[in-house]
């Protein structure tokens, strides 16, 4: 049997060598059919039975530049990696020997819809205890998993853990959220960290794994998941974990580095410019991209490229080959290209999502309410909540809105309305302009409560795992079709049933048709809003903060411009019904928004619509719109506006009426508005801060 040597690693053709069990290599590279039959990707599948391994040998030493220090002694020079070309044929005797060991070496190159993860008759783990005495997972980790009450493997864990432990080229794993994905990469990275601790005699010897995620909230959730297992490990074998995320003080100490680091891209890129910080990453073994499709969607690819270059530059010559693991709910041509650049041109690929598996989990019951207009939509939603609170005391709901200002408005408005109409439910809110401590507190309180409502932006659409969410509600079309699936995925988790409810108006119906055509989304029940008991007038007697309302609708106009372009919706109709909602909220039938709010829409609007709903001026009825910037392609904010919700602190309760503003007992004005970031056309969301 021919052997190709990769540095210190040994790769037998078709068989990765472990100390006890031989496993087949997973499918090499990514098949075209997994990219929605895209013609952009023409690379044929690799026939691993032919035994061909191709690579170029290239080694280049790079210098660390820009620090003003000689870092050769500190971190060594860089080995960009070498590979050796070999061509070999498996003999018949070797094939027979493999069959005796019950190893499936068959890879059907024509079967591009399903790539088998592993096929071993004598090892099909269903519980973590099945790994005992295999030499794959250290007993100290298995005991810690048991103490943390992780006993049974989920389907993704059954398919993926062993290949992730054995891969030499790195791996792309397609997996849905809520399927046990975090534990899937936790185990191989923890195994590597424990081995490093043993080898170093319990001393800190640098970072072993870095996990890169799109949001602070997801980073903290993964951190908590690791801590559950680490609590069961003691003594010199126990690895340490820290985070490097925007908006919070680092828990990472480069002078005594933890073995595992969880990071958001912007903060990691910035900190790697520090020689001291970078020196802790010279012997990194694992790099994990979690929610990789979202990392690319929100515009982090240039940042990830920069991080990749930095890591390659600072790794020492004698470091083991870097293993990169990428997890994503969707895998398309763009992500495949990213994986080839960051992982390996012939990366291992495993698909844990069955070909005929619906985009939305079968445990999620999808319901649509067709509303007459935006006023009817918000009124019906409030009455829907009122009825649920009466009928289901343990109701736990997440409400998704498109902008941070929309979250602030609905949070304050619903809090007052619930108080006014004796609707007994706790309300929390979460978005990127709140401080990290406020966000963490809101999420923790929502998780802890048996019932409640969390109003949030897309920041919580991916990765955030809250047990017991019974309902997910969406009041606007998602900016991207894929986001719908991720939002509804917050319910129906861990085998429990959930309900996803979409409130939609006639001008937005093209969005529903796109959901069906692109994602196969069908609604089991479609109701008219009149079927809801609308006994409470949501708007009667309410006195909202006009500044908050102006901020909401100012940024909403830019969002409407974006979705009208994406889904080919009539901008005139969207503006008419939403400005009518604005008037109903303020109870001013002739109220108009500033013409500046329509700047992203102006070319699509009829002149009569512009005259009816907008006026020349500095900010609608009350000069609002400072503070958030919101959606759109321009900087909408101005200095002197309201920024009362972005800060840290205020002494009011997190539950009702908690404005969490900067300074004072009532969370008053901070005195400085913030301009908006560029809109979606620039690649990143205008709510970029939600993602770091």
Curated annotation (Swiss-Prot):
EC code(s) of this entry: 3.6.4.13
Motif DEAD box per UniProt: ranges: 290-293
Keyword list, A-Z: ATP-binding, Helicase, Hydrolase, Mitochondrion, mRNA processing, mRNA splicing, Nucleotide-binding, RNA-binding, Transit peptide, Translation regulation
Main location: mitochondrion
Matches recorded under Gene3D superfamilies: P-loop containing nucleotide triphosphate hydrolases
Annotated organism of origin: Lodderomyces elongisporus (strain ATCC 11503 / CBS 2605 / JCM 1781 / NBRC 1676 / NRRL YB-4239) (Yeast)
GO molecular function: ATP binding; ATP hydrolysis activity; RNA binding; RNA helicase activity
Name the record gives this protein: ATP-dependent RNA helicase MSS116, mitochondrial
Enzyme class, spelled out: hydrolase
Xref: SMART domains: DEXDc, HELICc
General function of this protein: ATP-dependent RNA helicase required for mitochondrial splicing of group I and II introns. Also required for efficient mitochondrial translation.
Record's compositionally biased regions (Gly residues): 661-670
Organelle transit peptide residues: 1-37
């Amino acid at each position: 049997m021919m052997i190709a040597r990769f540095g210190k690693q040994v790769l037998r053709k078709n068989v990765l060598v472990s100390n006890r069990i031989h496993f087949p290599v997973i499918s090499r590279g990514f098949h075209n059919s997994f990219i929605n039959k895209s013609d952009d990707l023409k690379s044929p599948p690799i026939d691993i039975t032919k035994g061909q391994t191709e690579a170029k040998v290239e080694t280049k030493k790079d210098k660390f530049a820009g620090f003003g220090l000689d870092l050769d002694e500190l971190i060594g020079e860089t080995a960009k990696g070498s590979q050796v070309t070999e061509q070999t044929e498996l003999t018949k005797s070797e094939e027979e020997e493999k069959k005796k060991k019950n190893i499936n070496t068959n890879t059907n190159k024509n079967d591009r819809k399903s790539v088998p993860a592993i096929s071993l008759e004598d090892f099909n783990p269903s519980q973590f205890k099945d790994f005992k005495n295999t030499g794959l997972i250290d007993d100290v980790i298995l005991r810690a998993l048991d103490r943390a009450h992780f006993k049974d493997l989920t389907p993704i864990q059954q398919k993926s853990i062993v290949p992730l432990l054995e891969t030499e080229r790195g791996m792309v794993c397609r997996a849905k959220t809520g399927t046990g994905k975090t534990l899937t990469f936790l185990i191989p990275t923890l195994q590597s960290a424990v081995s490093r601790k043993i080898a170093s005699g319990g001393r800190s010897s640098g970072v072993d794994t870095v996990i890169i995620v799109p949001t602070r909230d997801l980073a903290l959730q993964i951190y908590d998941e690791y801590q559950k297992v680490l609590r069961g490990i003691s003594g010199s074998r126990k690895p340490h974990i820290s985070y490097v995320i925007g908006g919070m003080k680092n828990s990472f100490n480069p002078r005594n580095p933890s073995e595992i680091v969880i990071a958001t891209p912007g903060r990691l890129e910035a900190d790697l410019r520090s020689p001291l910080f970078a020196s802790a990453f010279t012997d990194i073994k694992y790099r994990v991209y979690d929610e990789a499709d979202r990392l690319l969607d929100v515009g982090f690819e240039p940042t990830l490229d920069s991080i990749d270059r930095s890591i390659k530059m600072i790794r020492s010559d004698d470091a083991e080959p870097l293993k990169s693991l990428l997890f994503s709910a969707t895998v398309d041509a763009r992500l495949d290209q990213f994986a080839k650049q960051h992982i390996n041109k012939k990366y291992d690929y495993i698909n844990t999502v069955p070909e005929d598996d619906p985009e939305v989990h079968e445990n999620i019951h999808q319901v649509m309410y067709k509303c007459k207009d935006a006023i009817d939509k918000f009124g019906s939603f409030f009455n829907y909540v009122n009825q649920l609170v009466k009928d289901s005391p343990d109701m736990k709901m997440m409400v998704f809105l498109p902008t941070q200002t929309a979250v602030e408005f609905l949070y304050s408005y619903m809090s007052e309305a619930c108080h006014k109409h004796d609707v007994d439910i706790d309300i929390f809110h979460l978005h990127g302009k709140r401080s990290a401590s406020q966000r963490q507190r809101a999420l923790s309180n929502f998780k802890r409560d048996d019932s409640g409502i969390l109003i949030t932006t897309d920041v919580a659409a991916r990765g955030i795992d809250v047990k017991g969410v019974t309902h997910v509600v969406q009041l606007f079309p998602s900016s991207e079709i894929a986001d719908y699936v991720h939002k509804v995925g917050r319910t129906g988790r861990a085998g429990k049933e959930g309900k996803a409810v979409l409130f939609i108006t006639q001008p937005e119906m093209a969005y529903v048709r796109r959901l069906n055509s692109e994602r196969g989304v069908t609604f089991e029940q479609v109701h008219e809003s009149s079927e809801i008991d609308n006994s409470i007038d949501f708007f009667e007697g309410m006195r909202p903060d006009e500044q908050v309302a102006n901020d909401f609708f100012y940024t909403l106009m830019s969002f409407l411009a974006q979705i009208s372009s994406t889904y080919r919706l009539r901008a005139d109709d969207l503006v008419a019904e939403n400005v009518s909602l604005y008037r109903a909220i303020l109870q001013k039938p002739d109220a108009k928004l500033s013409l500046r709010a329509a700047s992203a829409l102006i070319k699509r609007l009829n002149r009569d619509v512009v005259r009816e709903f907008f006026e020349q001026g500095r900010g609608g009825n009350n000069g609002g719109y400072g503070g958030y910037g919101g959606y759109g392609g321009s900087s909408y904010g101005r200095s002197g506006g309201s920024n009362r919700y972005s800060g840290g602190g205020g002494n009011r309760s997190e539950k009702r009426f908690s404005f969490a503003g900067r300074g004072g007992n009532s969370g008053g004005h901070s005195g400085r508005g913030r301009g908006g970031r560029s809109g979606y056309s620039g690649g990143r969301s205008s709510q970029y801060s939600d993602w770091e």
